[in-house]
Every structure is written in structure tokens, then in C-alpha cells.
Amino acid sequence: MSQHFHHNPVRVKSGSLFATASEALQARLSKIKRKDKECQAYFRKVIKSTFFQIVMITTVTTNSFLLVLGTNYDIQFEFFRTFEVSELFFVSVYVCEFLMKVYVDPITYWKDGYNILDVIILIILTIPYLLRKIKGNHSAYLHFADGIQSLRILKLISYSRGIRTLIIAVGETVYTVASVLTLLFLLMFVFAILGFCLFGVTDRGDLENWGNLASAFFTLFSLATVDGWTDLQEELDKRKFTVSRAFTILFILLASFIFLNMFVGVMIMHTEDSMKKFERDLTLERNLAIMEEKQIILKRQQEEVNRLMNTQKSGSMNFIDMVEGFKKTLRHTDPMVLDDFSTSLSFIDIYLVTLDNQDVIVSKLQELYCEIVNVLSLMLEDMPKESSSSLSGLS
């Protein structure tokens, strides 16, 4: 007890001291001002450009294709020099990529797990050269070193956001999947002991599949994947085990139809959540990019207006005087082209008021026209009476 209470504070204190020291070191490094900011910004722009990503994806894909061709001995023997030159080229490209990224962000580079993966791949690339240099071309581990060169295709992960999303989804399912696999292991343990006791007897049992605990586990794994379970059941039927069919059906129902489907369901749920989150992030990034473009355009327009207002025209006339003079020369019949003027709130307000006034004027004109028509009709009715009276007077 005393050791327990005296050990933990020391470890916590040492951990806090390490964290404090790392934070202090990081703060001190962040205060260092670089004198090559323009060059750093240029390389950052190059690394984040679409062209650079396409070049790296093409390089990794071509390298993987040549690795596949290298598995054919005849092709490798015929184009030996081509493979050697291409290998040097690919390694040079990977090293240049590493140096550029470290140059741009020498501190934050090591905080990204995918960058650490790239560094590990670079180390793996150097293993065959070191073995040939130290042990010669007949080293026992040289074939293994050549085989793990296929891991360089994992560099595509850092350039594919979709693959990174799937990896995040798999990482989020670790605890749930571990729980499901633990339950499956417990189920297999129970059925392995039961199968060993029922079908692993020495006189007439199936010793090849149920003779010991290891073979029983392997047999249950075949039953869980429903791979060759009919052959296993035929072996038990030949030995006339009456409960073998019930045992097999029960284990397949529990392991294959429940636990494995539960495992697949958990993976699908987390993958869907990650894909929805990925789509939301893409939408948010698009909206942010549009907002940034709008801000840049507005800032540029404001700078242009300020520049025009600050510049003086010949004859001591500034921008405001120019606008006032331009207003005096305008007529209501002059055509004008206004960009985005109709989207302003002031224009919409004036336009709505104008429409209301126009409606009022139209209604008044309609009333006036009705009155005019009424007066004209009355005048037409009175005209025959006046003509008849004039004719009677003449007679």
C-alpha cells in the first residue's frame, strides 16, 4: 500500500514535468522567426497544389505497377537496368517530398500520423540497400526486405481523403469490434471444450478435427465462416455422433448468423457515420471557400473605391465631384448598365415603392377613363334631342 501511494505521485509529477518541458520547447521554437517566409510560402503552395498531388499519386501508382512486373523473373532479368534506374528515381522523388514537407513545417510535420507512415516507408526503402551493402546479395533477410517494399503503396493514403475517412471509421469501431470478437472468442472457447469432450474421444472420435483444443478452435473457425462445414459434418456422421448435427447447427446460428453479422453491422454503421461527417465537412469547406472568395472580392472593391477617392483628378476635382458632375449630365432616357445594383436593399426598397406608385397611378387612370366614357355616353344620348328640336324650329 505504501509503495502504491508513493509511486503514483512521482509518475504523475514526472509526466507533468515532461509535458511542461515539451510545451516550453514548442513555445520557444514557435517564437523563432524564419527569414525565408517567401520561400516557405512558395513550397507550401506547391505541396498543397493539385498538380503536386497528381504527380505523387502517379508516381506511387507507377512504382507499384513496376513492383508487380518485378515479380516475373523473365521481365526482371531482361529489364534489369530499367528497374534499377526507376527505383533510384522513385526513391529520389520520395526523399524530395519528405524534405519539402519538413522544410515547410518542421514541427507540425511530426504530429501527423500519415507523415510518420511516410517516414517509416522511407526507412523501409533503405533496408534492401543496407542489407546488400552489409551482408551482400545472399543475405537470408533480403527476400523479406524486398517483399515489404510493397508497403510503399500505402503512401496513397495521405493523398486520398476517402481512404482516410474509412480508416477513421475503422479506428472508431475498435472498441465495439473488440467487444464482439471477445464474445465470439468466449463462444468458441465453450464450444471447443464441448466439441473436444463430445467428438475428441480416443476410441471412435474425430481426432484430426477435435483431438485437441487447438484443432477444435480451428474447426470452429471453419464452421463460423461456413467454409467446408459439410465435410466436417460428414466426418461426424460417419462416426455416428447423434448430437453432432444439433451442435453444428447451433454453433453456425450463433457464430455466423449473429456474431459475424453483428460485426458487419457495426462496421457499416460507423462507416455511414464517417461518410456523412465527411460530406458535411466537404460542404462546410465549400461554403468557407465561397465566403473567402466573396470577402476577397469585397476587399478588392473597397480598395479600388478608396484608391479612386484618394486620387485627385486634374483641375482639383476629386471622386465625389466627378460623381456629382456625372449626375448632372444624366437623363432619364439614358441607358445604363449596373452590375449587381438590383441586388441591393436600397434598390429593392425604391423599386417596391415605385411599383406601388405605379399601381396607384394605373387605378386613377382607369377611374378617369371610366368617367370620360360615361360623359361621352351621356353626350351621345343628348345629341338626338338637340337635332330634333332644331329641325322643328326651322319648320
Curated annotation (Swiss-Prot):
The keyword Electron transport does not apply. It is a multi-pass membrane protein. GO terms for cellular component: acrosomal vesicle; CatSper complex; endoplasmic reticulum; motile cilium. Residues 217-236 dip into the membrane without crossing it. Its main location: membrane. Residues 1-48, 108, 161-168, 269-395 are cytoplasmic. It holds the Pfam family Ion_trans. Residues 72-80, 132-143, 196-216, 237-242 are extracellular. GO terms for biological process: establishment of localization in cell; flagellated sperm motility; sodium ion transport; sperm capacitation. It is found in: Cell projection, Cilium, Flagellum membrane. Disruption phenotype: Mice are normal but males are sterile. Male sterility is due to defects in sperm motility unability to fertilize intact eggs. In contrast to the human ortholog, not activated by progesterone. Activated by intracellular alkalinization. Testis-specific. Keywords: Calcium, Calcium channel, Calcium transport, Cell membrane, Cell projection, Cilium, Developmental protein, Differentiation, Flagellum, Ion channel, Ion transport, Membrane, Spermatogenesis, Transmembrane, Transmembrane helix, Transport, Voltage-gated channel. One of its GO terms (molecular function) is voltage-gated calcium channel activity. The chain crosses the membrane at residues 49-71, 81-107, 109-131, 144-160, 169-195, 243-268. It catalyses: Ca(2+)(in) = Ca(2+)(out). InterPro entries: Ion_trans_dom, Volt_channel_dom_sf. Component of the CatSper complex or CatSpermasome composed of the core pore-forming members CATSPER1, CATSPER2, CATSPER3 and CATSPER4 as well as auxiliary members CATSPERB, CATSPERG2, CATSPERD, CATSPERE, CATSPERZ, C2CD6/CATSPERT, SLCO6C1, TMEM249, TMEM262 and EFCAB9. HSPA1 may be an additional auxiliary complex member. The core complex members CATSPER1, CATSPER2, CATSPER3 and CATSPER4 form a heterotetrameric channel. PANTHER family: CATION CHANNEL SPERM-ASSOCIATED PROTEIN 3 (PTHR47131:SF1). Belongs to the cation channel sperm-associated (TC 1.A.1.19) family. Pore-forming subunit of the CatSper complex, a sperm-specific voltage-gated calcium channel that plays a central role in sperm cell hyperactivation. Controls calcium entry to mediate the hyperactivated motility, a step needed for sperm motility which is essential late in the preparation of sperm for fertilization. This is Cation channel sperm-associated protein 3. The gene is Catsper3.
